[in-house]
Amino acid sequence: YLVARFTPAFGAVGPWRGLVIGLGAASTVFGGLRALRQTDLKLVLAHGTISQLGFMFVLFGLGTPYAVTAGCVLLLAHAAFKASLFMSVGAWPVFAGVSVVSAASMAGIPLTLGFIAKEAGYEALVESGSARGALVLAVVVGASMLTFAYSTRFVLGTLFGVHDAAPQERADELARPARGFLAAPLVLATFTLVAGVAPFLLDPLVGAASSSLEPGTSVHLKVWHGVNPALLL
């Protein structure tokens, strides 16, 4: 939030922009590599958060209108899928579907809000048209491959893990969660899918956030932008 707020004022001052973008790019790779090394599911999510925040640093540090929009969408997508994953991770089989949907958004699978955010972020970096932007884009794409890898590992470890010999027996020993607790991750996962299929519904919300950071920013989120470099990446 502070980076997003301060970049319009400090973006042209000294090394601010380069420092923020460089720190963000390094964090995307560091967080992704650390997430792949974890054996605790919550630690996978925690280190994955470092990677996602690094991507946000890159976008808000870049500071162009489209990058700011992409950063706001990524912030919203990350809040939805990561909150859902943290609430659903555990032994209860009822959370399996929620975990798969939320992990798909984390990985940037099409028809999820995570995909909309990731494509917008790529497009913002492509449009920057600079050598630095191309280098950062290459780093972010590499980090996104790590994100896909640890998201897949999360799902496979949750559904098909071999270290837990009797997950159902362990689940039976736990107190059943309250209905409200069951509903919260389900609502967030549903939001991820609905926003991924109809992202234009978020235009007023994302537009208001983007305009507060970069006045005059116009937001028109779509599922299909045609075949372009961002989609191919």
Tell me the role of every PLM-derived stretch.
Residues 153-233:
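Cytoplasmic/organellar membrane-interface segments at the starts of transmembrane helices
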Residues 1-173, 197:
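Hydrophobic transmembrane alpha-helices and their helix-loop junctions in integral membrane proteins
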